Amino acid sequence: VGLRIEPNNHKAIFQLGNIYLMEKNYSDSIKFFDKSIKIKPNFWQAINNKGLAYFEENNIDRSIKLFERAISIEENAEPLLGLASCLRTKDIKLAVELTKKALNKNPNYVDYEYRKEQLWGEKLQTSTETLLKNEQLQRDVILAKSKINSSS
């Protein structure tokens, strides 16, 4: 009903994309994210979530481009960590650097359940969990967890 009243509401269209993402219907989620981005080209959240969907479809190269584009608009923790997870097997040095930056911006991303609430799929979650076990990140992971615990 809301979209019939306001068909160019990029946020409403984005939320429909998120519903499809939660239902693991990645192709439809991507279509809605595309519509949202067409209306508002710098809507980094839709660009980011399109990257999440492509990761679950094993299209890592496309995810990388989308996360990089989202970061170029808004250097937010979510696309930083998404990109880091994509690069985990390609460039571990850069992946570690991006992870440190992401956890510094928002320590909540160290938490599996928090990422799940942000609609991260199983494949990206698994990749991120592996990345967070990297020896070079242990101090950052502990620090992020302590920041979460001290704020709750």
Give the residues covered by each predicted segment.
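Structural signature of tandem alpha-helical TPR/SEL1-like repeats
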Residues: 1, 22-35, 56-69, 91-98
